[in-house]
From Swiss-Prot:
Example GO biological process: terpenoid biosynthetic process
Source taxonomy: Eukaryota, Fungi, Dikarya, Basidiomycota, Agaricomycotina
Organism annotation: Rhodocybe pseudopiperita
Glycosylated position list: 82, 103, 122, 295, 379, 423
Cofactor: heme
Protein name as it appears in the record: Cytochrome P450 monooxygenase ple5B
Gene3D superfamilies: Cytochrome P450 (1.10.630.10)
């Protein structure tokens, strides 16, 4: 029998033994990477190193998170390599973890790409400890008072008249007209800009491009955020191409926002004041640099531009897909207000079915189906599990809005549910189960929520009063439903964005057409 003499451990070179032991430890740690610790909430099975990363692209992320919620419960965990992600799927969990413990869970995760783009000056993504967040948040809350919101109504009504006239004259270019109207309104509120009647080649086009760049940055930042070592590769070297793109985007954004703030300052120096937000930050700089003030003002556009425009488009999709709802809104308008006058902002409160329709669109197609993530500063406990310090915490807004435990027939479009209960939830459920977290939770609730709802509500009310919306059978891009598969861009995980679509828009009658023309001529 052949015998082989193997060296004993005692006879090994100490350097070889140390290297072998070190390699074994490294391999063990590598294999542990991505595994779920026993104290975490449950979640889908992991793979060594990857954790659950290999599962994240199987379907549109909000739907995937919701599928896991049905299997693993109201709070579950994911592992993305060495990162722990906690997903909240119930109103109770959100209130307990984000609202009641907001001082612990109110931070944002660090993103090398977003940080390079914002230069640490965007309060939406900055830590609660920074002066950017503290002074910026205070300034916005002090500005968006009830009296200030009331002061915007005349301009909101003007822009809605301009929009109706645009659609009357040029319905096929609906998306651009909606974009023009909303951006013109925002530029007035933030910078005191006069109403702009065109889009292309104007400050409105530049402002929209600047405001939507941060979404493109966030969508394309996965690589460097997952592998932070890429941040250390110098610009110009392989693997650092993202830095060139981000810097170009940043320079463009800063140029646009600085120019807008400069314009507001020049108007103030000339004795012209409109009560805009820029005047407030210029009057009370609180030690902030001009670039900080520019980013604070521009943050209004970052947050409000794309979201409100997408929501209005989703409302139009719903009107086309559900003509019975469109008729009910119009019948309510005619019955409550009559047929011979244009509705005004104050009429919104007299139209319960319209308000229910607006809420149902937000529930079924939330603009932000997965809220921007929070980060925990300390270990937390929930349901017998530990949510460790540094965990990234997501609110699954899509999942809560489509939860059959909360809503009857959650996949159906039924505005009537909001006429039965204030939250649209099943009759008999506690008010505490209100799943309306569309504008955030805890320390990160969007301060512009009321402004957004007031503006979009007025626009949709007047569009329904003025026009009928139909599928356009002569156009290949027409729509007849609002299904995710047919109508929405599922390549974007953190937004519910309607794909471009065509429709037919016709005035309801000659009297309304004449009223629109008269109102526009009077602007």
């Amino acid at each position: 029998m052949l015998s082989v003499d193997l060296p004993s451990v005692a006879n090994l070179d100490p350097r070889i033994a140390a290297a072998a032991a070190g390699s074994a430890v490294a391999v063990y740690k590598l294999l542990q990477l991505g595994s779920r610790e026993s104290f975490l909430p449950p979640g889908p099975p992991t793979r060594p190193v990857l954790g659950n990363a290999h599962l994240m692209t199987k379907m549109w992320l909000p739907m995937q998170l919701t599928e896991w919620a049905r299997e693993y419960g109201e709070v579950y965990s994911l592992k993305l390599m060495n990162r722990t992600v906690i997903v909240l799927n119930s109103p109770k969990a959100v209130r307990t973890i984000l609202d009641k413990q907001g001082n612990i869970t109110g931070d944002r995760p660090f993103s090398p790409m977003i940080s390079r783009y914002t230069e640490g000056l965007n309060l939406t993504v900055e830590s609660m400890d920074t002066s950017v967040w503290k002074t910026g948040r205070k300034g916005i809350h002090n500005y968006l008072t009830p009296s200030a919101l009331s002061g915007y109504v005349p301009r909101q009504e003007e822009e809605s008249v301009n929009l109706m006239h645009d659609l009357l004259m040029d319905a096929p270019n609906r998306p651009i007209h909606i974009r023009r109207a909303m951006m013109s309104l925002l530029l007035h509120i933030v910078y005191g800009q006069p109403r702009c009647e065109s889009y292309y080649g104007t400050v409105i086009e530049n402002a929209y491009e600047a405001a939507t760049r941060i979404g493109q940055i966030a969508h394309n930042g996965a690589a460097v955020d997952a592998f932070p070592f890429l941040d250390y590769i110098p610009r110009g070297f392989p693997g650092a191409g993202w830095k060139t793109i981000v810097d170009e985007f940043k320079d463009f954004r800063n140029s646009v926002y600085n120019s807008l703030l400069d314009g507001a300052k020049k108007a103030m120096d000339s004795g012209i004041r409109t009560g805009c937000f820029a005047e407030s930050v210029i009057d009370h700089p609180d030690g902030r640099s001009w670039l900080e003030l520019s980013n604070l003002s521009g943050g209004f556009l970052d947050a409000g531009a794309k979201t409100t425009i997408s929501y209005i488009e989703s409302c139009i999709l719903a009107l086309i897909a559900h003509p019975d709802c469109q008729r009910k809104i119009q019948d309510e308008l005619d019955h409550v207000l009559g047929t011979e006058t244009m509705p005004c902002f104050d009429d919104l409160e007299r139209l319960p079915y319209l308000k229910a329709f607006l809420q149902e669109v937000l529930r079924l197609r939330p603009v932000g189906p997965v809220a921007l993530p929070h980060v925990s500063r300390e270990n937390l406990s929930y349901g017998g599990h530990v949510l460790p310090e540094g965990s990234m915490i997501f609110m699954n807004i899509w999942g809560m809005g489509h939860d059959p435990e909360l809503f009857d027939e959650p996949e159906a479009f039924k505005p009537e549910r909001y006429l039965l209960t204030s939250n649209g939830t099943k009759p008999g459920l506690s008010e505490d189960v209100n799943p309306d977290f569309l504008f955030g939770a805890g320390r990160r609730v969007c301060p512009g929520d009321k402004l957004a709802k007031r503006s979009t509500g007025l626009f949709i009310m007047r569009l329904c009063w003025a026009f009928n919306f139909y599928p356009d059978s002569s156009n290949k891009d027409t729509v007849k439903n609002m299904n995710m598969e047919d109508c929405y861009d599922k390549s974007v995980s953190l937004e519910t964005l309607p794909l471009p679509f065509a429709c037919k828009i016709e005035p309801r009658d000659k009297m309304k057409e004449d009223l629109i023309k008269e109102a526009f001529a009077a602007l």
